[in-house]
Amino acid sequence: MIKNKRNLFFCSIFYLFSVDSDAEKNLESLMSVLYSQTSGEIKATFVQTYNTATELLDKAINDEDWDAVLESEGKRNRTPAIILDVDETVLDNTPFNARSIMNQTSYPEGWDIWIYEEKATLIPGVKDFLLSAQKRGVKIFYVTNRRTVYEEATKNNIKKLGLPFDDDVDVLLTRGENGWGSSKASRRSYVSENHRVIMMFGDNLNDFFDLPDKADYVSRKESVLEYENMWGNKWFMLAN
């Protein structure tokens, strides 16, 4: 917390004395980071999301028809599992965003350095939820579009934070691994072959289903409504 406040302080000072022509853009970025790091409301939504999911665990585990993956073939007698995106769903990278503002850089510049530092912190509520799921025999899978080259550092970061991580099974599925592209559909299918995915978590619609290339805001809204029965019981969107 102290480190985050220090980041915010220096970000604010940097902006006040900046003469960059992109000052308006810098201000937007600064306000976004300030909100993410200081807002009680956004933290409450994270905790609320994971608390709601915790309350549904037993129901989801015991219902053989409870399946969160659209690509699933509906096989019976599979081990229950949960799929989570990593960035801004499990790991909080707002210190990286603050650093980018201070350095006048933008993603992906510096992203690899940040990952290798293994210093991302937890999204509020996620640890208690995952530990509760693990105690119930649920397998935890992390499906991320971080590239395969970052897999070891990402695994280390997750394990340092005390989150469930199975070393006997590949539970961290990265972009580029096994020929997987940026679409997560193939990785969802991979997990669902032997596991009944009872819940999925993410901060982007593509964490739950594939959208058409260059989908506009209208089609995105329509897609959300098409699957409205999934949100809040099988699918959980986190604010970003």
Residue ranges and their predicted role:
Residues E88, V126-I158, D203-L205:
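Substrate-recognition element of Asp-dependent hydrolases with the DxDx(T/V) motif
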Residues N51, R147, E151-N240:
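C-terminal cap/substrate-recognition subdomain and adjoining C-terminal extension
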Residues I82-N93:
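Asp-based phosphoryl-transfer active-site loop
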Residues V19-L84:
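Non-catalytic pre-domain segments flanking phosphatase-related domains
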Residues N4-C11:
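Sec-dependent signal peptide recognition
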Residues S12-D20:
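Hydrophobic h-region of N-terminal signal peptides that target proteins for export
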Residues Y35-A44, D112-K119, F141-R147, G176-E177:
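Second-shell loop/turn segments in exported
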Residues L91, N97-L122:
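Metal-dependent phosphoesterase signature
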